[in-house]
């Protein structure tokens, strides 16, 4: 499970990305270590990149800093489990080993989908039951319906609030001030 949810547990990364949600002198330029190159040079978030996140929810999800900023926002709303589930499903779809697929599927189900799961996502009864049935023979698509529901929920609910949030607006403002 640790490998599956590693981005959440990487304290150094969380600390550095935490500056996306705080205004302090130490991180007012919104720098973050590249997730694929930890302990290397810092990269600045450009105004263009941050502005593109408003184009669509999928654009936001395709950008590593967009995901980090959205995660920080969701934490303030106590709903980061939705994004964590979506990311876990994306990672799960890359699984090639049948043995690992079954193990990962059960971990994701127990962590996010099952009733009273530690980080239970908000999905309807039919979707939860369909996903439960899919667990009898897990496949790369066993979470597609639940993941789609969570994606829609975030896109229609959390994403518009994120774009209006002080956090996002401050991030845009800070990146624009750097250009001046």
UniProtKB/Swiss-Prot annotation:
The family database entries (InterPro entries) matched by this protein are listed as: RGS, RGS_RGS8, RGS_sf, RGS_subdom1/3, RGS_subdomain_2
Subcellular localization, as worded in the UniProt entry: Cell membrane; Membrane; Perikaryon; Cell projection, Dendrite
Task: Tell me yes or no: is Membrane among this UniProt entry's keywords.
Answer: yes
Q: Which residues carry this modification: Phosphoserine?
A: 26
Q: Cross-referenced Pfam families, in alphabetical order?
A: RGS
Q: Which GO terms describe its cellular component?
A: cytoplasmic side of plasma membrane; dendrite; neuronal cell body membrane; nucleus; perikaryon; synapse
PROSITE patterns the record matches: RGS (PS50132)
Q: Which UniProt keywords apply?
A: Cell membrane, Cell projection, GTPase activation, Membrane, Nucleus, Phosphoprotein, Signal transduction inhibitor
* Oligomeric form and interacting partners: Interacts with GNAO1 and GNAI3.
Protein function = Regulates G protein-coupled receptor signaling cascades, including signaling via muscarinic acetylcholine receptor CHRM2 and dopamine receptor DRD2. Inhibits signal transduction by increasing the GTPase activity of G protein alpha subunits, thereby driving them into their inactive GDP-bound form. Modulates the activity of potassium channels that are activated in response to DRD2 and CHRM2 signaling.
This chain's protein is named Regulator of G-protein signaling 8
Source organism of the structure: Mus musculus (Mouse)
Q: Which gene encodes it?
A: Rgs8
